[in-house]
Curated annotation (Swiss-Prot):
Keywords: Antibiotic, Antimicrobial, Disulfide bond, Immunity, Innate immunity, Secreted. It is found in: Secreted. It comes from the Eukaryota. One of its GO terms (biological process) is innate immune response. Antimicrobial peptide. Active against Gram-negative bacterium E.coli (MIC=12.5 uM) and against Gram-positive bacterium S.aureus (MIC=50 uM). One of its GO terms (cellular component) is extracellular region. It comes from Nidirana okinavana. This is Ranatuerin-2OK. It holds the Pfam family Antimicrobial_2.
Length: 30
């Protein structure tokens, strides 16, 4: 359903955002 698709997309965006944040905090190359 559309809701499931939206939930999946939100999870992916959140995961990508967290990865970038960890990257900046640790000072490693992304």
């Amino acid at each position: 359903s559309f809701l499931n698709f939206f939930k999946g997309a939100a999870k992916n965006l959140l995961a990508a955002g967290l990865d970038k944040l960890k990257c900046k905090i640790s000072g490693t190359q992304c």
